[in-house]
A protein has these predicted regions:
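Bacterial Sec-dependent N-terminal signal peptides
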Residues: 1-25
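Short loop/turn segments immediately following the C-termini of beta-strands
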Residues: 32-34, 78-80, 124-126, 134, ...
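Beta-rich, blade/repeat-based domains predominating
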Residues: 36, 58-68, 105-116, 150-173, ...
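Short loop/turn segments immediately following beta-strands, especially the blade-tip
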Residues: 43-48, 88-95, 132-141, 189-195, ...
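A short beta-strand motif characteristic of beta-propeller blades
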Residues: 51-57, 98-103, 145, 151-158, ...
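Asp-box/WD-like beta-propeller blade repeats and closely related beta-sheet repeat scaffolds
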Residues: 95-166
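Loop/turn-rich, solvent-exposed surfaces of beta-rich toroidal or solenoidal domains
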Residues: 257-321
């Protein structure tokens, strides 16, 4: 009889262990500040519960990046000709902010990335990419325009000129990629010996409107969301070259509002957000060949501009700008399904979430 009950007991213990898996960390949140937000917030994330810990004043810090040692947080200032990059001292153990500094450069940067000892910004209105040096003290300074573009696309409203929306370093750290929503292309910059130089251009279908992209954990595939087409493209990455291999619909309403995209930590699922109508997050399962298949859709509050998956993959947290709320979803690792937990944190115009790891 002991052998009969041993397997169920082990299964019950394993299930209980899964339920008790703990995730406690600190998040930081960037915002738009026209409607009363203070700037950048630190938030305690405790097994799906959210509590504001601290904040620091900033003007439209709409995208954030963290130094490797988490001692500094960098944020764009998306403010027309007054744009640039903030550097905030930060204590990752407590979630408290210290001194802040500002370096001017760019026109409405909407994204930034750390590339070695530089910070690179994607300037939406300027149609350009800027770079800032990171000093020995961790402070961003000496900003300059690295490359400017003047392309266009078939959408007479959204694609009159180039709009650089996102920059990301490839997994092998040999290239920096920059999406141009206005000209339907991805620029590839060679990264070598501390220099970043334009190398090649991948032209996409007219009207695709490339916005954000993310690589699979193994670095073999890249997933690109088209804000204007409402599609997600799978690209193969090999020896510095991106090759499109498949496209799948993300926004069935075709309202030209697709937003953010992220891959689960295990690489089995891809999530992409839609805005402007039928707001929500599309769930895709990843096939063996890296292509995607649609397995679900989860409604969200209005305008999920940005979202993040928790480090252990148990939760997805969405920043819903127009409803001034951050919402938490439990994530089933086996099926990819998202389920609202009921946890909501009211915050004015949240638009960027990052975990402090």
């Amino acid at each position: 009889m002991k052998h009969i009950y041993l397997l169920p007991l082990l299964m019950l213990t394993a299930c209980a262990g899964s339920r008790l898996e703990s995730e406690k960390s600190i998040m930081v949140c960037g915002t738009y500040t026209a409607d009363g937000s203070h700037g950048v917030y630190s938030i305690v994330f405790d097994n799906g519960k959210l509590t504001v810990e601290d904040s620091v004043a900033a003007n439209n810090p709409s995208y954030l990046a963290l130094a490797d040692d988490m001692s500094h947080i960098y944020a764009v200032r998306e403010d027309g000709e007054n744009s640039g990059v903030y550097t905030f001292d930060f204590d990752p153990a407590t979630g408290h902010f210290g001194e802040s500094r500002f370096a001017a450069e760019g026109n409405n940067p909407c994204h930034l990335a750390i590339v070695g000892d530089k910070i690179v910004t994607a300037n939406y209105s300027g149609g350009s990419v800027s770079e800032f040096e990171i000093g020995a003290n961790g402070i961003a300074w000496n900003g300059r325009t690295m490359a400017a573009f003047a392309g266009c696309g078939p959408d007479s409203v959204r694609q009159k000129t180039s709009h650089i929306h996102y920059t990301i370093l490839t997994p092998d750290s040999t290239k920096l990629l920059a999406t141009d929503l206005g000209a339907d292309c991805i620029y590839g910059f060679a990264v070598k010996d501390g220099n970043i130089t334009l190398q090649d251009t991948l032209q996409l279908a007219p009207g695709f409107g490339p916005r954000h992209l993310e690589f699979s954990p193994d670095g073999r595939f890249c997933y690109l969301i088209g804000e204007l087409s409402g599609d997600v493209m799978t690209l193969r990455y090999e020896q510095g070259t991106l090759t499109p291999i498949a496209t799948i619909e993300c926004d069935s309403l075709h309202v030209k509002g697709s937003g953010d995209i992220h891959v689960s930590p295990d690489g089995k699922y891809v999530y992409a957000s839609n805005r402007l109508a039928g707001d929500g997050i599309r769930t895709f399962a990843v096939n063996d060949d890296g292509t995607l298949r649609n397995v679900g859709y989860t409604p969200t509050p209005s305008h999920p501009r940005n979202f993040v998956i928790s480090p252990q993959g148990n939760y997805l947290i969405a920043a819903c700008k127009n409803d001034n709320v951050i919402v938490v979803y439990a994530r089933d690792k086996a099926t990819g399904k998202l389920t609202p937990t009921g946890e909501r944190l009211s915050l004015s115009s949240p638009v960027c979430l990052k975990f402090v790891k």
